[in-house]
Amino acid sequence: MSFDINWEQLRNDSNLNRTVTEKLNGYLTSINLPSYVNNLRIERFSMGDRPPKVTLRQITDPVQDFYDAINEELQMSAEEETEGSDDEGYGGDRVRNRGIDTQTVFPSANDVQFLVEMEYNGNMSITVTAEMVLNYPSKKFMALPIRLTISNIGFHTLCLIAFLSKQLFFSFLCDVTDPILDEDDSILDQNGPLLSSKGPLERISIIRSLSISTEVGEEYQGDGSVLKSVGKLEQFLKEKLKDFLRKEVAWPSWINFDFYEPEDNESDDNQIN
Amino acid sequence: MSFKFNEESFLDNSFNETLREKLTKMLNSRKSMDIKIDDHLSYANNRGSTSCSNNFDNSSSIKARDSKLDILKSDVKVCEVNFPTIPNLEILDLDVSGQPRALAKGICKISCRDALLQIQTEIEANSLLLYTNISPDFTTPLMIANDTFTIPITMTFSQIQLEAITNVFVKNSGVGISFNDVSLDFQFDCSIKLLQPHIAKRLRKSMQLVFKDVLPSALFNMSRSWFTHDGSSSQTTTDHSQEEGSRLIRLHRLTVEDLDLQDLSPVNMLKLSTLTSSRQTLSLHSTMPKYFSTIPGCLDRQNFRNFTSRMPCLSNYGGGSDDGDKHVPHIHNLQNKNLLPEEALEENDIDLKAILSIQTKIYERGISTNNDVIRPRRRKIRIKRAKKSIVNKATETSSNLNADSEITPVSSSHNATSSVNTITSLTTSSLGSTAGSSNSKNTNRSSSFTSSIMPITPLAQSSMNKKDGNLITLRQDSKVLDSMKYFTKIQDLHNIHASFNSSRETQDSNNRFRIASEMLPTKREISPIPTLNSFIEPNRRFSFVGLNHKTSHDNSWSVDEQPPPYY
């Protein structure tokens, strides 16, 4: 473990869970939800008492792919600017030359890339509530409350964090074998280990264990029933989340935080934080 | 109660009002139903740009309506609807599948109490007149009492108690509801006391039909408008997309012209015919576990699993410092997992490049099978001072791509890749029927052959970010370039032969299969030497022949020699 996280202190800070909840709720109210979802908020958030393990494995120069991506982008914007009569394809040397003409990022001494192993198998838990709304015949005519409790999050992955030309790249590279998590998987797998290998090889799953417990419906004046632990719904949500992460942040996809500020802003000092 | 109803809409009577309006409309729709159907017909006809005689339709339907016995003299008017207690809707079971055919299904219990419904209309009491009106002219005797006698009638349903278990299916197109176990009870009160028992009896009889047929279809039709927001526009968009699809299909349909036929290589045709004919035998050679197939360079379906298990993945990744020659890929775990061994981390034996290339390869292979994501998503989040603005675009792609749209590849191999993909998928589907015939274009045929046998990465799918440097290193390898000529364009036969031979020579003697050798994580693969397909020029046609290899077998497949006997 390269990073020492003082989790005890976090855990004992009783205000922390509350502030995190408030911050998240503030964010959730600010975003635009689809019309059939209403009242999305975090009801409870608990950090858990086990810290994540973060281990720094390598510090190297950034891989070429990041430079390629930046250059390609610069090229595109340059092409958009100089877009005129010429509109034929991307092939050939001509475009490359033009790219060099405009702007190209080369590896510099300040660029750095970290290969970090992240491991978490703690008891963080989040409770989210939302309402599915039927806007017919009048607005918010009928609502179905849903409560999700997410816990038992476990992952053990290698991530790539690179910083170059004022941009931060983050990508999950691959999963790492983990005795506890692997065992979890086989239990969760309904088809058993022999039948499960039907589909194509999964590149990465990032979140290896996750339990979602659902509550659909709400009692009203002590009347009616609440549907609990809807297995299919839980499975569905899990798959969606995994797919989303795999699509968005798993190599060769990545997230790119751009800290570059164009100079036409009032401030011309380049801040890097 | 699981579902929460908005109490306000019940308190301020708005719900009752809307329901009253809807009911009035619905009850009167029966009268104008025929006209409506006509409207729909003519509308559909107009859309289909076939001019149909609407007049004829109208007149015929009016006749049909006239010939029915209709005692209603005026529209049905719903006077009052009242739900003093809020209905109760409980969810009993829920099943989410996420498939477009059936997104979700659930079992619900509906109950409502004390509801009140009052309708008013006028009826014709002179039933003799009704008969006279519809009977043909030649009937006798002539009626003298042919005055109308209109009586207003009010029917009140009070104390409606409904309890029902319903199955609800949510689909992409709408909501389907079926009512099971309906128990309905109400007090019926009619302003004409004489008719009350009779009407009550008939009503109770027809209730079954209402819950079995009328309500579900009405609800389904209604729900269609929720799902498509505004029905008309969505209709057109689906039409549009369909048109688009058919246009695309038309675009990629292969047309074989005489010129193309000249390009067909006899060598390839021979090989393809061998391949098809070998399928017609019952040879069991290929089931031997050691070999992938009896035909070199091709993979038999029963060995597919064996083959895929040797694909590069992190579980059989041996670390960077291994000696390439010693590295024998072993069959990886059966659990279909791609995990980096922890020991490799502990020993700090990490070859970042190898991991990256393996992950990229697996990603690309996923594309070829799923066909959904073409380019990796690389979102850019611009961070300014305090506030974040999320630029919702996939990297450097043009800004007109919105977040939900599939990302198109922008790398230089774009054109080649996408077109080859589509061609491959299209021809693969038609392969079964046309396998024996030689009418389609050879290049596409052969590429579809390989892909139908093994869903490996699309061959033109160059690893996206390999670029200039690789090109230079490759130029030094003139032999590979020789064979590249074959892949990039179809030249005369002589060239093909030459490339065949040269590609044969470039094979390592221990690499039994060309494709297999590309897939396997040999040292060659891991080292930065690019694969052949990473520098195919984008706009050229190319083909991949899965049979370009023959080393240790007796029946060598050079052009000068005879083809192997059919197995």
Curated annotation (Swiss-Prot), chain A:
Gene Ontology terms: cellular component: endoplasmic reticulum membrane; ERMES complex
Assembly mode: Component of the ER-mitochondria encounter structure (ERMES) or MDM complex, composed of MMM1, MDM10, MDM12 and MDM34. A MMM1 homodimer associates with one molecule of MDM12 on each side in a pairwise head-to-tail manner, and the SMP-LTD domains of MMM1 and MDM12 generate a continuous hydrophobic tunnel for phospholipid trafficking.
Skewed-composition ranges (Acidic residues): 78-90
Region annotated Disordered, chain positions: 76-98
Membrane topology, record value: Peripheral membrane protein
Organism annotation: Vanderwaltozyma polyspora (strain ATCC 22028 / DSM 70294 / BCRC 21397 / CBS 2163 / NBRC 10782 / NRRL Y-8283 / UCD 57-17) (Kluyveromyces polysporus)
MF (Gene Ontology): lipid binding; lipid transfer activity
UniProt domain SMP-LTD: residue ranges: 1-260
Protein name (record): Mitochondrial distribution and morphology protein 12
Main location: mitochondrion
Gene Ontology biological process terms in this record: aminophospholipid transport; mitochondrial genome maintenance; mitochondrial outer membrane translocase complex assembly; mitochondrion inheritance; mitochondrion-endoplasmic reticulum membrane tethering; peroxisome organization; protein insertion into mitochondrial outer membrane
Family affiliation: Belongs to the MDM12 family.
Function: Component of the ERMES/MDM complex, which serves as a molecular tether to connect the endoplasmic reticulum (ER) and mitochondria. Components of this complex are involved in the control of mitochondrial shape and protein biogenesis, and function in nonvesicular lipid trafficking between the ER and mitochondria. MDM12 is required for the interaction of the ER-resident membrane protein MMM1 and the outer mitochondrial membrane-resident beta-barrel protein MDM10.
Compartments where found: Mitochondrion outer membrane; Endoplasmic reticulum membrane
HAMAP family: Mdm12
InterPro entries: Mdm12 (IPR027532), MMM1_dom (IPR019411), SMP_LBD (IPR031468)
Keyword vocabulary terms for this entry: Endoplasmic reticulum, Lipid transport, Lipid-binding, Membrane, Mitochondrion, Mitochondrion outer membrane, Transport
Domain notes: The SMP-LTD domain is a barrel-like domain that can bind various types of glycerophospholipids in its interior and mediate their transfer between two adjacent bilayers.
Swiss-Prot record, chain B:
Swiss-Prot/TrEMBL domain comment: Lacks alpha-helical transmembrane segments, suggesting that it resides in the membrane via beta-sheet conformations similar to those predicted for other outer membrane proteins and porin.
Region entry Disordered, spans: 392-453
Coiled coil: none
Assembly mode: Component of the ER-mitochondria encounter structure (ERMES) or MDM complex, composed of MMM1, MDM10, MDM12 and MDM34.
Positions with biased composition (Polar residues): 392-416
Stated family: Belongs to the MDM34 family.
Cross-referenced HAMAP family: Mdm34
Cellular component GO terms held in the UniProt record: ERMES complex
An example Gene Ontology biological process: phospholipid transport
Matches recorded under InterPro entries: Mdm34 (IPR027536), SMP_LBD (IPR031468)
Keywords: Lipid transport, Lipid-binding, Membrane, Mitochondrion, Mitochondrion outer membrane, Transmembrane, Transmembrane beta strand, Transport
This protein's name: Mitochondrial distribution and morphology protein 34
Gene: MDM34
Location(s) in or outside the cell: Mitochondrion outer membrane
Extent of Low complexity compositional bias: 417-452
Membrane topology value: Multi-pass membrane protein
Function: Component of the ERMES/MDM complex, which serves as a molecular tether to connect the endoplasmic reticulum (ER) and mitochondria. Components of this complex are involved in the control of mitochondrial shape and protein biogenesis, and function in nonvesicular lipid trafficking between the ER and mitochondria. MDM34 is required for the interaction of the ER-resident membrane protein MMM1 and the outer mitochondrial membrane-resident beta-barrel protein MDM10.
Limits of the SMP-LTD domain: 1-224
PROSITE patterns membership: SMP (PS51847)
Chief place of localization: mitochondrion
GO MF: lipid binding
